[in-house]
Amino acid sequence: MALTSDLGKQIKLKEVEGTLLQPATVDNWSQIQSFEAKPDDLLICTYPKAGTTWIQEIVDMIEQNGDVEKCQRAIIQHRHPFIEWARPPQPSGVEKAKAMPSPRILKTHLSTQLLPPSFWENNCKFLYVARNAKDCMVSYYHFQRMNHMLPDPGTWEEYFETFINGKVVWGSWFDHVKGWWEMKDRHQILFLFYEDIKRDPKHEIRKVMQFMGKKVDETVLDKIVQETSFEKMKENPMTNRSTVSKSILDQSISSFMRKGTVGDWKNHFTVAQNERFDEIYRRKMEGTSINFCMEL
């Protein structure tokens, strides 16, 4: 599948089991699939634009007992290896993870069916964050506009069709969320909602701490809540991707950390799109007990 970016270059996405992925990821697929997870690994799992960087910073702050300086040791993308990441000649996510001492905190956007089997076999812990599909779509649209490693999204109307048909990198939102939701009672999965973290960060961060087997006092917990707020992270060069070259992420088009709100979809969806989306959602998510908050 070749899609032209606004740079005029062809970005040819490749497919694995019906899911579109970046070409370098697919070229590295056998290495990714044979990745050796360890029983004490914690894997942060999200669909793209569902609060990945946010939960990474929360987890790291907990791991470092609220020590802000320790969390400044490296940019966020270097702290938690992204297992399916590949961009030769840079070390791949798998190589970075292999070089990391245990216990490891890793990251993925892969669906349950594409995840390296060793994660299931080793009974690892999984931390999944889900965000409502409409806000995910809006955020992903703006991310594709500014990310030169991904195909140009076209107009909002065109992207709406692309997204609902699952023809985006990492595949269908519906399949991704449904897959992880259905696995949550069979494995060590803490399933969180972006909207809940937004509504009551302290309550949700406490859940993450308990899941990680960590204890911090109330003062430290309050500090973690404060330091992982959208406003703080947007200004933090270790989380806001400001160190990434403009040739890769052009933040003059759209900020990497754009709004971080619940309900921004209402500024993008037409009435007709909203009605159509709701109908597709009902059909695709039929039989699942999952419920999303669409506005706060």
Curated annotation (Swiss-Prot):
The keyword Metal-binding does not apply. One of its GO terms (molecular function) is cholesterol sulfotransferase activity. One of its GO terms (cellular component) is mitochondrion. Its EC number is 2.8.2.1. Found in adult stomach, kidney and thyroid gland, and in fetal kidney and liver. Keywords: Cytoplasm, Lysosome, Mitochondrion, Phosphoprotein, Transferase. It is found in: Cytoplasm; Lysosome; Mitochondrion. Signal peptide: none annotated. 3'-phosphoadenylyl sulfate binds at residues 49-54, 131, 139, 194, 228-233, 256-260. InterPro entries: P-loop_NTPase (IPR027417), Sulfotransferase_dom (IPR000863). It comes from the Eukaryota. It catalyses: a phenol + 3'-phosphoadenylyl sulfate = an aryl sulfate + adenosine 3',5'-bisphosphate + H(+); cholesterol + 3'-phosphoadenylyl sulfate = cholesterol sulfate + adenosine 3',5'-bisphosphate + H(+). It is an enzyme of class 2 (transferase). Its main location: cytoplasm. It holds the Pfam family Sulfotransfer_1. Belongs to the sulfotransferase 1 family. This is Sulfotransferase 1C2. It comes from Homo sapiens (Human). The gene is SULT1C2.
